[in-house]
């Protein structure tokens, strides 16, 4: 969140002196402004409430009260006050902007987006409105729209390192999604091998990169840059003509989109590293890179540097906790997720990770409460249902286990382990037909996994969400 005083200076108007000669009113107005300047929003709220009761039809005064409530973390009350301000003057910027921010703080991006879009329409050059509209789009998984907003912010405010980082993250996610689409459209095609080779080359693994480029070149000898990539790494390129059947236009399109997104992401991150090499965002970029390279110890160290520079940055304790879980250090991870929960109490993903960690530590009742809370929040991860399914299976509550696992598998159809757990639930229910179906799905998906190519496995690892082994906690001291 940006510093309160920066926002106040840009958005608050206090027209009271022109509207009344009352010395008492002026005194309360001055007290409100003084409280804002020193960050005492509790007092500012009290002063603005006094003024608003005496000038209930003043839209700007209602807006000022709403902003004070917002910075006092009274988001629901702020929204109600902003609504009143907008009924008096629908074209005020601050009520739309801060209503959107309040909904975002309440983890309600669907409600935040329309307000922030209106704020941008009212003032297209407002950096704050565009930045948070971008974040709200990210929360909705609308990454292309988010990238457009962050790109505009970097144009309006070239020194805004947060916007450059967010832009890189948006393009990274766009590239990830295009890569997954490529793997679905042509899992063993030349472009998948090419993309895997490029990723390995970026990591500095020339030998594996060459092997992947040779596989790609063998499948698509018609692509000049593939021949060049093979030869540049010391290999011998294939120059035989490719058959028309080997050319997949969709494959080429998806590769081009994934490649372009990756380049744009890298350019944004490189800008951060060049413009602000000692910033918390630069250290975050390095930490994220260590995660992709499966170097969790280095990632944790880099993330801790981020926290030294900006202790209240959301997502960092979560990232450390996830890395600790992957290392089998569940007790330490619990501390990190609890710290993250203080920063993001309404985050479904944080609550789900906390619930998973509690399960690993054998704190089943706490885990259940946390996971059920996650399911009541905005866009809960499907994993919450999987974890509840495992918990209910452990309790021999087979019906509840089957219900939760089926909800999980409705979206995560290729999780072989979940199908196996579901078969156990149906066995407990003496439902042989459903048990056999679940086992057949388990066997099929397991065989499909064995048949996956090296390129598929490499790209899936690089482009997947960070995965935590549920059994990791059992190995912790």
What is each model feature region?
Residues 25, 59-60, 93-94, 127-128, ...:
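Helix-start (N-cap) detector for alpha-helical repeat units in TPR-like alpha-solenoids
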Residues 37-38, 71-72, 105-106, 139, ...:
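Register position in tetratricopeptide repeats
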Residues 50-51, 84-85, 118-119, 152-153, ...:
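Canonical positions in the second alpha-helix
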Residues 54, 88, 122, 156, ...:
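Structural marker of alpha-solenoid helical repeat scaffolds
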